[in-house]
A protein has these predicted regions:
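Conserved pre-motif I regulatory segment
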Residues: 1-38
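Conserved nucleic-acid-binding Ia/Ib motif block in the N-terminal RecA-like helicase ATPase lobe
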Residues: 3-8, 62-117
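Generic leucine side-chain signal with a strong bias for well-ordered alpha-helical environments
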Residues: 35-38, 50-51, 68, 74
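The conserved Walker
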Residues: 39-43
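Gly/Ser/Thr-rich beta-alpha loop segments that engage phosphate groups in nucleotides
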Residues: 44-46, 98-99
Length: 117
């Protein structure tokens, strides 16, 4: 597994502390539990599931996770948050409305560990 420093990620995201939901999610992930998050928009769900996701990735340059979302805008937003975490883990978003060959080229050159689509 990749060593991820949560405090460093929070500092990069300009977050002083985790919300109760985010803290519970991190704790339950460490216990090996499956999680379902139900919470209003803007409550921090993205960070709540991205922190355990990045902690679960191995130090291998292969695709390890796919995050499925209902819209292009949300895919781009999550990709941006992921990159802002500053982990150095390669991530890309894939969505309709752009040439498939462009995505294929990007995927081959980037070799993402995480795809958001």
């Amino acid at each position: 597994m990749t060593h991820i420093n949560i405090k460093e990620i929070l500092w990069k995201l300009h977050i002083d502390s985790l919300t109760a939901m985010q803290q519970t999610t991190v704790e339950e992930y460490r216990k090996g539990k499956d999680l379902v998050l139900l919470s209003p928009t803007g409550s921090g769900k993205t960070i709540a599931y991205l922190l355990p996701l990045v902690q679960s990735l191995k130090n291998e340059n292969v695709l390890q996770a796919v995050v499925l979302v209902p819209s292009r805008e949300l895919a781009l937003q999550i990709e941006q948050v992921f990159k802002s975490m500053g982990t150095g883990i390669p991530v890309m978003s894939c969505y309709g409305g752009r040439p498939a060959m462009d995505e294929h080229r990007t995927m081959k050159s980037l070799n993402p560990q995480v795809i958001i689509g």
